[in-house]
Amino acid sequence: MVIKSVGIESDKNSDTNERLINYNIEKPQVTQNVSNQLILTTLNDLYNWARLSSLWPLLYGTSCCFIEFACLLGSRFDFDRFGLVPRCSPRQADLIITAGTVTMKMAPSLVRLYEQMPEPKYVIAMGACTITGGMFSTDSYSTVRGVDKLIPVDVYLPGCPPKPEAIIDAVIKLRKKVAQENLVERGKLAQTHRYHSIKHELTLSSPVYTGKYLNSSARQTPPRSLSEATGVPVNLIFEMTKKNAIK
């Protein structure tokens, strides 16, 4: 005697019917092998990926920082793996790397090179002299105190000079910035004033270093704590310091 469950058979039939509906010819089943061969992306991401993988820099070296960048051309660091191809013409470059001191005479040339580069274009400021003027930032009449006064900077790379590893890190940060850009918002984020057109107005002032030290009143009059510690009156100490200064 064989006993069959009617409910179980009906459940099986419903499962088979559901499979036939879901996995028919018009709707093929997506397997794991097929999903591994598909890449889903957008046109914006594809465009950014192509640009960040082929940055063509224009090397603008005016000082000793450029020697550190020249180390990247060798096989030890091999910056070609990032798609960097140095160009000699600004019309073929989309990245300019300023390395070294920027003087007043070189400022118009730098701005002209930047204007000749096609859009979109990026700037990496390499070294302390490029970012703030470095050791030439004080008492210098011929040095630009920061290249961002001339052209917009995307990545600042401090150091005196920065190591080749730091340059690679700056390039990686720039690649991340390029990957996050949007084609629709690029026109809205475009800078209207790319550099300062106002000329430097240098005014004459009294010299800071006159060669005479201890001219301040605090330096000329000894503190009372000194007289109390030595037991000598303040007036006597003041006269002694005055005689030594005359001698």
Swiss-Prot record:
Q: Please write the reaction equations for the catalytic activity of this protein.
A: a plastoquinone + NADH + (n+1) H(+)(in) = a plastoquinol + NAD(+) + n H(+)(out); a plastoquinone + NADPH + (n+1) H(+)(in) = a plastoquinol + NADP(+) + n H(+)(out)
InterPro entries (UniProt xref): NADH_UbQ_OxRdtase-like_20kDa, NADH_UQ_OxRdtase_20Kd_su
Task: List locations, semicolon-separated.
Answer: Plastid, Chloroplast thylakoid membrane
| Residues binding [4Fe-4S] cluster | C64, C65, C129, C160
Q: What is this protein called?
A: NAD(P)H-quinone oxidoreductase subunit K, chloroplastic
Q: In what way does this protein cross or attach to the membrane?
A: Peripheral membrane protein
In the record's cofactor note, how is the cofactor described as bound? Binds 1 [4Fe-4S] cluster.
NCBIfam families given for it?
Answer: nuoB_fam (TIGR01957), PRK06411.1 (NF005012)
Which branch of life, at top level? Eukaryota
Record keywords = 4Fe-4S, Chloroplast, Iron, Iron-sulfur, Membrane, Metal-binding, NAD, NADP, Plastid, Plastoquinone, Quinone, Thylakoid, Translocase, Transport
Q: How does it assemble?
A: NDH is composed of at least 16 different subunits, 5 of which are encoded in the nucleus.
Q: Which organism is it from?
A: Mesostigma viride
What is known about what this protein does? NDH shuttles electrons from NAD(P)H:plastoquinone, via FMN and iron-sulfur (Fe-S) centers, to quinones in the photosynthetic chain and possibly in a chloroplast respiratory chain. The immediate electron acceptor for the enzyme in this species is believed to be plastoquinone. Couples the redox reaction to proton translocation, and thus conserves the redox energy in a proton gradient.
Question: What Pfam families would the database entry show?
Answer: Oxidored_q6
Top-level class of the enzyme under EC nomenclature: translocase
Q: Name one GO biological process term.
A: aerobic respiration
* Gene3D superfamilies from the UniProt entry: 3.40.50.12280
Q: Which cofactor does it need?
A: [4Fe-4S] cluster
Taking the first listed entry, what is the main subcellular location of this protein, grouped into a coarse class?
A: plastid
For this UniProt entry, the molecular function terms from Gene Ontology, in alphabetical order, are: 4 iron, 4 sulfur cluster binding; iron ion binding; NADH dehydrogenase (ubiquinone) activity; quinone binding
**PANTHER family from the UniProt entry:** NADH DEHYDROGENASE, NADH DEHYDROGENASE [UBIQUINONE] IRON-SULFUR PROTEIN 7, MITOCHONDRIAL
